[in-house]
Amino acid sequence: MIYRMQYRTAALVMVIFALACAAGCSSPETAAPSVPIITTEPTIIPTPESTLATVQAADMALQLTDIPPDYILRERSVMTSPEVTQLTRDLGWRQGYFVTFDRTGRSRNDQTRIRQSVNIFPVENMNKVFTLEKVALSEGETPFSSPYEIPFPTIGDQSIAYRMTNTPDEGQVTYTVIFTKKNAFERITMAGTSTDYETLKDIAEMAGAKIL
């Protein structure tokens, strides 16, 4: 009797243990919390634009195709050190180039000239070069007229334009534009009896675009 009760008790314990094991095995495991993956975008550092022109002064010069068709090419040449002033050399002048175009109208007295000069300096001297040239232009009075600043599109890094009557004869006018871009300084003049302000603006913008 005692053995039978012990047997039943042991059997009951085994059944309970088996059920507990089955319940434990069948219960789902607790899922580990998901950790978000953070991706870092690469930092893009813009390449700074060069402050030095990548083309030679001769390649910045205007071409005949840039000028109205009634002009002819008169002269184009490199500039040499003796052709520039001592002050220009003191400012570190390195090289230069100039080109001249002429136009003759229906009469011998109707003549107009476009001249461009390109000069290369150390980039750290460009502000000084521009300031000195601007002062020289603004103070360039003649017995007949004084230069005065005129509205003009911004060309390059710094630019300014002047208009002046050269002689007592009506119609003789000189426009002068100076500008800097990178380490290049340019002066463009249009002088004569058939000057054209709008044409000058187009020419100056083309000249500025040639400095790369």
Regions found by a protein language model. Name each.
Residues 1-43, 47, 67:
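Secretory targeting signatures
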Residues 72, 122-125, 135-138, 205-212:
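Sec-exported extracytoplasmic/periplasmic mature domains
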Residues 183, 187-212:
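Surface-exposed amphipathic alpha-helical segments
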Residues 33-105, 142-155, 199, 203-204, ...:
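N-terminal "mature-domain start" segment
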Residues 111-115, 170-176:
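Short, surface-exposed coil-to-beta transition loops
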Residues 145-174:
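Signature of long, low-cysteine stretches enriched in small and polar/charged residues
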Residues 115-117, 178, 185-189:
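Structural recognition of the beta-strand scaffold that forms the well-ordered cores
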Residues 95-134:
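A short acidic-to-branched-hydrophobic micro-motif
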